[in-house]
Amino acid sequence: MTEGAPGPVQGPAPGETPDRAGEPMGKAVVFALAAAAGLTVANIYYNQPMLGLMERGLSGHAVTYVPTVTQLGYAAGLLVLVPLGDLVERKRLIVLQCLALTFALALVAAAPSAGLVLCASLVVGLLASVAQQIVPFAANLAPDDRRGAVVGTVMAGLLCGILLSRTLAGIVAGLLGWREMFWLAVPLALATTGLMALMLPRSRPRPTDMSYGGLLASLWSLWREFPALRRAAYVQCCQFGVFSVFWTILALRLEEPRFGLGPEAAGLFGILGAAGVLAAPIAGRIADRRGPRRVIVMASVLTLASWLVFALWQSIAGLVVGIVVMDFAVQASQVSNQSIIYALRPEARSRINTVYMAIMFLAGAACSGTATAVWHGWGWSGVTVLGIAISVLGVALQGLRRG
């Protein structure tokens, strides 16, 4: 098999699974994929509850842009690494990317300056995009009538990683320091590498004559071909945008004299997002039975409601209620939109997922960076105005879809 042009598939070798929908997959594999998705995506969120500590430990405001840089790296990984999932053997790709992520995390932990932390964080984001190799792999292995539920389970694992990463980072940073948290992430990434090497079936991509360059060029063609992909991406840009705005600023908000809370509290708030974990499989099952569009409309309205709560109920109780509603809505929308895009062209799922997720994370990075600038200029009031404006746009997009 030549590089970039796999030959015809003669059938799976022992231990191999053809990379196509409908093949049976055991629960152990589903849960391994869910765990790996959570453990890998966690690495782009460890920094959020620790921003206050990092800002004090490294001079200047530059370090407060670590979440933005990390998300930019993640978006870059989606564009240049995730498309390989349609071209090369997925198990090997996932294992190698997890292993490289281990070394990138060590670079962040050891970086002596804000500039080097930013550079190393960019690499962490790039390699953590392996989480988006895992999600379409699960979709490809799942039978058609279980795809929504399987994707929902894997996405629940991914969301657990997002939520628990903040909790773990907040507690560890509060007790030991932010560098120690990144050092702890190193063996966690190494354990993920071992889990994937042990549990994943080998697979072969569908036969194709497309080179890697052609694969990347095809992303634009897929974007133009499928209006449903564009609609899903636009809607989720708004959802993930406000999600990024909130979690980027939360630790800084809690450190204000009004609350006087440290990274441990910021991390514990992450547990409240468990509502999103519940939303993932529920939304997947509803999408399978009644169609995903109803779920997406409901989620857009709930997201706007959560930001009205943040703006009007400025207390710990208001933050609690808003987080539960927002995380439930964002995750329900995500699972439903992915249910739509994964049905468009099965042999191009990795590339379709690349387009969708790259645009979503570029929007997240832009909103995160904007939120940081707004915070330094106008404080929490400015941030809530930003969140409400983006949420209103998300609701307006539902009206355009219906029209």
Put a short name on every predicted segment:
Residues L78-E89, L278-G291, W375:
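Helix-to-loop junctions at the C-terminal end of transmembrane segments
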